[in-house]
Each structure stands twice: as C-alpha cells, then as structure tokens.
Amino acid sequence: MKPKDSLCMNRYMCILVAFLTLCGQTALSAQTYEQVLRRNFWNGSSNVAGIRQDSLSRSYAELSGGYDTGGFKASWQAEDAWNAGARTASIRHLERISFKGAFSFRQWEGYGMCGSMFTDPGYYPVDVLEFTPGRKTLQTYALDGGFSYDVAPGWRIGAMADFTSANMAKRKDLRHDNWKLDFRIAPGFMFHKGDLAVGASYVFGKTAETVKAEQVGTAESSYYAFLDKGLMYGVYQVWTGSGVHLDEDGVNGLPVKEFSNGFALQAQYKGLFAELEYARTSGSVGEKEYIWFRFPGDRVDVRLGYKAAGRTAEHYARLDFGWKSQAVFESVLEKDTENGVTTVIGHGSNMIQRREILSLRPKYEYVAESWEAFAEAGFGWHNGAASQIYPYVQTQSLMKAEVRAGGMVRLAGVVELAADVVYGWGSVSEEDSQVAEDAGAQLAPYRLQEWYDLQMEYDTARRIGAGLSVKYDFWKGMYVKAAGRWLHGFDLRKLTGADRMEAKLAIGYQF
C-alpha cells in the first residue's frame, strides 16, 4: 500500500476503535457478536436499513495468528503460510438510529508460491501466471460502516459502505507487485408495519487491481509467463512479450477493473425473509486506448431465511442461490507509429470466452441455550466455453460439492467446544469441436495442460476433513481461542501431498 493510503487507513482505524470503545460501555451478555448477526436476516442483506429489526447491541475486538501447511492445495496456493491480523466489529442500537461497522487488518506470508499473479485467482475471467516458486506477502485492510435511521413511523433509511485495500509483493524473479481496491456502497430504505417489512436498496461496486512485474536478477534467459484467456488456453511466452501484456509501452503494469450497478429487494413476514439482488457488471483489462479485453456480465443472488423460536431453542433455515454469467471479448488493436508518435487503432473485437457459474447453499441451525448444531451443503457448477482461434471451440462442465455438519457445546458457561466434519467431491467433463470443417489449416490454441490438470485434480478430488476449536472466556468478556483443521484428498496423482492442515490462535474481547 502506498504511504498516503496507509496513513488514511490508520486514521480510519483510530476513529473506528474510538467509536467502538464509546459504544462498548454496556453490560456483558452471553450472546456473541456472531450470534447477534445470526438473529436478524437483514444483517446479511444488502440493505442496512433493516438492522433495526433487532435491538441487541454487541461488539468485539480480536487479535489472531495462524499457520497453514500441506500439499493438498490449489495450484496458486502456498505450501506453507503464516498470517496475523486484527479485527473489530460492532452493532449499536440507539433510540432512533443504529450503527454497524468493522475494521480489520491482515498480514499474510506464503512460501514456494507461483501460478496466478492476482490476489484473488479465478475472480476475473482472464488470468496471468508465472512459474518461479518464491515468497509472497499480502497485506489487506478492510473498513465498512453503515447506519439505519427512523425518519418517520414505519419508515427507515440507511446506507452502507465497504472498502477493502490490498497489496501483494513477490520478491523473487519473476517479481511482481499488486495493488487492489474494492469499494461497495448500498443506500436503501425500508417500510415496516406489524409483522411485515419490505425494503429496497441500490448497490454500486468497483474492484480494481494492477499487476506490475519486473526482473531484477541476472539470468541467461528471461522468465516466461502465461496469459490464460479461458479454460487455461492462451499465450505462453517471455514475460516481456506483447502477448501477455505485462510489459507494454504506455501502460502501467497489467490493470484490471470491474464495475457493478444493481438493486436489491427485501421482504420479511414474521420469521420468513427473502432477498433478490441483481447487478449488471462491466469489466476491462488494460487502460486508456490499450483495452485488450472487455468482460460484461450479469449476476443474480437470492437469499432465503426462516427462523422459528421455541420455548428452549431456535431453528434457522437458510438457502442461498447465486448465478453469474460473463462473456469475454478480445480487442483487435493495431499500433501505428508516425513521426515518433504511436497511435492505437481498434478494429473491433472477438468473443473468445463465455462462462456461467451457479451456486446453491442450504443450511440448517439448531440453537439451544448451551449447545448448537448445524448441517449445510454447498454445490457449484461452472460451465465454460473458449474459442480463441477459429474454428476451434472448447467447452467444460465442472461440478463441485461438499456437505458439512458440526456443533458446539458450552461448558460451565466459560468454555466452548466446537467440532465439524466435511466431505467433498467433484467432476469435470470436456468437449473439443470445430464449428467449420473447411476453415483451412489453423494452428490449434495452446493450452497449459500440466497446470490445468493440476487444478482440476484439486477441484474434483474426493476429500474428507474435520475441524476442532476451543474457546475460553477467562475474564469479563476477554477470551482466548485455539482452532485446528485437517483436510485429506483421495486418489491423487499430480498434487504434491494428500493433506492440508491449519492452526489458529486468537485473543479477544467481546462487549
């Protein structure tokens, strides 16, 4: 992060911590911040005006550190990684207004890393890879805040803003620095009368990331990079080549950005809640006249929830559905240099990729006074098609699924023991075709097959896992927590290991 941005984030942190400290002068309660969030479905919606549907105020602050290790990992993940961070969050309800806010910082360091050069691999429909294992450092700052205000009997307004800034650095050739910024704002309103409440909100978002690569050390030959244009088909060449766009004259690195504009509608009747959110997205790779790719798309999210309260326990049922569709257009650009001045001439674009992503996640929770239990499942379908060179067309259908169950028990009012188990699996199918038999001799598109096979094995391998955590409340809201997780994959041929382990320690204060 640039020094100016870091100074601003430190100021925001001081302001937020002071706010939470002032708000925290209340009596302690058995219910934690996460449990208060769960009570009100509006807390997880895109309309912050609904947070006043509940009246409990809770806050917490936590310092944590963790370690991950093992060879059962995605192609871009670290074999070993450390992390440390701090987070504070609060919900506060006053007479006519409520506030919700959070701040977090995380320092993460991974070893033996290569592959995707982005901070969130897979988010964008195009990717860029490098192949020299080395250490990466990632810093992430996140700040969000919102309010809900009673403007008149039965009417509420609110607004929420989320801000995340991240910077990543790899200090071994091929070196690269990343700067990422995510911003989301959602103003909204709500009408409520008796057991009925309805609301609507506008949602605007922007995400932007720039990858800047460089080679510092001396080598007999330059390092190679790969530009993935879809399904791991693309361009493999020296990183300074024009095909991977990491070192283009007139462009600062490889910039990617995406905007989203949409709306969300919410409705609640007694314990039943529903939300529909739609967004139109527009993304690009490049800047100024050098726009190499554009990727417009659509996104729909549906969130359903039901809460039933009994005499001694509460039942929560949730169902989340997501759909995302994107198309990728590659621009046909020509550079024309005259009298030392270079201009870029555009000759249209070709659609080289389409992808559609579906997700479904049902969850049930049983919450009693001294123990809880849950069961959930997650299903994801990824359907993609790539056509970079006419007349070749490649299609893929990828499915991933997992089921998870677990519970938590409180002992003597100060100790919480939690455990869960998980089972996952997946499948992938592909088909290659030609849309025309008489298109003439054309060289088939290049695929980074070894890396593709490695990632598909990780995505589709059968796996089992388990997690265990212990939390101890030792003094007036202060607590310590230790957690561990283990994951094991079956029938592996390409991955370097069959196990992945995680450990975490935390100390915090809830008020």
Located regions from the model:
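Outer-membrane beta-barrel transmembrane strands
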Residues: 78-84, 135-152, 160, 178, ...
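Outer-membrane beta-barrel "beta-signal"
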Residues: 499-511
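N-terminal, post-signal peptide beta-strand-biased segments of exported outer-membrane/organellar beta-barrel
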Residues: 26-111, 124
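Outer-membrane beta-barrel channels and translocator barrels
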Residues: 93-97, 150-154, 192-194, 270-272, ...
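Outer-membrane beta-barrel translocator domains and adjoining extracellular loop/strand segments
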Residues: 71-77, 111-118, 168-176, 211-217, ...
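Transmembrane beta-barrel strands of outer-membrane/channel proteins
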Residues: 59-67, 101-107, 159-165, 200-206, ...
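Long, internal scaffold/assembly segments composed of regular secondary structure
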Residues: 236-372
